[in-house]
Amino acid sequence: MVHCPRCHRPGAAVLCADCQYWQQLLPWLDGQAQHLFAYHSPIQTYFERFKRQGDYQLAAVFAADIGDWWRTRRRHYDAVIPVPTDPVRARQRGFDPVTALFASVLPLTPVLEKQGTTLEQAQQDRATRLTTRQPFIYQPKRGVRLRQWRRILLVDDIYTTGSTLYQTAAVLHAAGSDAVMDTFTLAR
């Protein structure tokens, strides 16, 4: 299957419109977007139950798949940074879905926080997602040496337009990182 070389969106073997948009805004960003599954009906149903209905037990369903993916790539990354969830939604749900999906398998280094409450991605159209104001901030942690990391893996649950992942990369870059930043999501 032919796809965008950066985000793997099905289509032509050239950068898709979303990746071209982000390349213009963040020309220094040259990482790759990786995912395990296409976001189709079974995965949509999974996320409906996991995130919308708050079925925490579903967090473990793909742990083996994520672990298999990670075993072949872990030596390439100095840090794995989870995309933070809106704290209000995490309290309502009872858990942070990104941490729930990845913490048992990946060595997460949470150095980002989401500030304020924003409309859920699922409730926004593509244009709104692409132009959402920066909701993330870098929170330095003791022992974390952001500037020493050469390659960072940003993890999130779903990749749609890339806006969330690009916004997190921009915050890390503004905080002094010049690392290559790849992304990994369960679904795209």
Language-model regions: role of each:
Residues M1-R188:
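Glycine-rich phosphate/pyrophosphate-handling loop used in enzymes and phosphotransfer proteins
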